[in-house]
Amino acid sequence: MKKLIMALVILGALGTSYISADSSIQQASGDYEVAGMPRGA
């Protein structure tokens, strides 16, 4: 049971860091559009 809880905690930490990185990329995508790259790339 403890391993399952640890796995959930690790997945949760990875998920939140991925979401925050994704939002940072979306905020910076305006700069990429100026450089000719499509939004969300």
Curated annotation (Swiss-Prot):
Keyword set includes Secreted: yes
Keywords per UniProt: Latency-replication decision, Secreted, Signal
Signal sequence range: 1-21
Domain of life: Viruses
Site, Cleavage: residue positions: A35, G36
Keyword Secreted in annotation: yes
Example of a GO cellular component annotation carried by this entry: extracellular region
A single GO BP: latency-replication decision
Protein name: Protein AimP
Organism: Bacillus phage SPbeta
Gene, per the UniProt record: aimP
